[in-house]
Swiss-Prot record:
Main location class: cytoplasm
GO biological process: threonyl-tRNA aminoacylation
Keyword Aminoacyl-tRNA synthetase found: yes
Family in the record: Belongs to the class-II aminoacyl-tRNA synthetase family.
GO MF entries: ATP binding; metal ion binding; threonine-tRNA ligase activity; tRNA binding
EC number(s) stated in the UniProt entry for this protein: 6.1.1.3
Domain TGS: start-end pairs: 1-61
Subcellular location: Cytoplasm
Name assigned to this protein: Threonine--tRNA ligase
Catalytic activity: tRNA(Thr) + L-threonine + ATP = L-threonyl-tRNA(Thr) + AMP + diphosphate + H(+)
Gene (name only): thrS
Entries under InterPro entries matching the protein: aa-tRNA-synt_IIb, aa-tRNA-synth_II, aa-tRNA-synth_II/BPL/LPL, Anticodon-bd, Anticodon-bd_dom_sf, Beta-grasp_dom_sf, TGS, TGS-like
Amino acid sequence: MPVITLPDGSQRHFDHAVSPMDVALDIGPGLAKATIAGRVNGELVDACDPIETDSTLSIITAKDEEGLEIIRHSCAHLLGHAIKQLWPNTKMAIGPVVDNGFYYDVDLDHTLTQEDIDALEKRMHELAEKNYDVIKKKVSWHEARETFVKRGETYKVSILDENIAHDDKPGLYHHEEYIDMCRGPHVPNMRFCHHFKLMKTAGAYWRGDSNNKMLQRIYGTAWADKKALNAYLQRLEEAAKRDHRKIGKQLDLYHMQEEAPGMVFWHNDGWTIFRELETFVRSKLKEYQYQEVKGPFMMDRVLWEKTGHWDNYKDAMFTTSSENREYCIKPMNCPGHVQIFNQGLKSYRDLPLRMAEFGSCHRNEPSGALHGLMRVRGFTQDDAHIFCTEDQVRDEVNACIRMVYDMYSTFGFEKIVVKLSTRPEKRIGSDETWDRAEADLAVALEENNIPFEYQLGEGAFYGPKIEFTLYDCLDRAWQCGTVQLDFSLPQRLSASYVGENNERQVPVMIHRAILGSLERFIGILTEEFAGFFPTWIAPVQVVVMNITDSQAEYVNELTRKLQNAGIRVKADLRNEKIGFKIREHTLRRVPYMLVCGDKEVEAGKVAVRTRRGKDLGSMDVSEVIEKLQQEIRSRSLQQLEE
């Protein structure tokens, strides 16, 4: 006779097995109507699953994160239901949940068009509005296989043959005449699945293997209510306006082309942003006492075999050969930094040694995964490695954390989610070493008053790590910063120092990245600011323009003064109407426009306008220069008078 303990500690006694739905109904009809699933003894189960022993139970509704995920998963099944009605010969592969939605990989005898997607979405809505019950049946492996063989679902049969044990009991979910297989849980009724939209299609190889057949992947988004769906679609619309690829072209920052996939051709203005970002990072390296080094971008394969990268990472590495030797173009900087550390005998007095590099790295990313500046093959890491003793780890991690927040705040990123990944099952190093390392990371976060969550077992085999994920103005997550302890690489590459006891010891290595890659971070900044870069990093900070030819000499003189003051400035002396010039430079997101007419020439002043259309009136030239220098020097996010 099960006793069910609820989250508030109250208990309900039953004289027979019950389901989460039964318990919800016992509490009240309102809760029963809202019930999507249950969490029994910490495990998610369907609303209909029996509870036969004393258990803890949480009712899952659409307000819960798990509830929303279940809705999305059930919408994938709804897609399967609809597509089989429209094109009965479709073979269904897999349909998991992803961020903000779901997808289904399907094998179809024609390429889906936008008209097909519209028809599919319409049929999904028609089916969902029937509010039919979803029926779950646990069956034997053999019965499940027979079901899908009869239906010609070869991919489901393959999953059963290769991924599910013969003594397992797969869950079959019946959507009227359509049957899908899943661990679940799923919604009990399709009334929960009314707020969705199909978004796009893409190609995807079965099981991610390019030797297998290319399937069509249909992406969708799903939400608990109409308001949340509309808000998400509005965010997507705003994101499309901010797309760094579109703005990059509009502002002439960079381009990419077929002959160099995933490689950036930086134009003058984009390269100006890149170099300003480098200058900013360099200023922080100096402040936090780092050395800056530069390693070769290509090293012998033998070295990468020593590090373990060749065994674990070779598919992502570009290689070349010369004089019967094979070389790898570096995908990361760390092995090169150990080589620099190894030059000359090191003492404990030399530690900590902080080594930074703007490392030019290359990774052989799949062509289908490339995306503007966000996913490239050639990129520049703001990478650093700290060699230290075990006793120095906590202080060094502390400094890394301060540096991360210091740099992110410069760009206005305030929402940062922090996760601490702990020891995986397969690892090197003693439990004592891991205990200390994990404690050092946790204490460093606590000392900086930073809330964090643990990712148990998600650390690398060679050490625990902290991940920093920043959220932009559209609440999109970007994982950029990492502080990773490494007990393995220094040992593999024979790094050592002479300790206080006059014996050789292996240093702890801390991998530290803040921006991640400069290319990707510029993409993030472009979308965060919609191309309205803060003045200090804007490619052109000021345009000086005349109204008639009679002010040309004054404009040139003023331009020289601004250049001498360290301000990036252009003169626009074209024979165009002043309104045309202002509009053009406003569209180019130039922070300031200085207009010179006869009145300004006579008074030795300029009329100042911002790219947001604000007229700051007439100002002395010296005052303008002083204010601009202050804004640039302080790396302010605000313009004058804001």
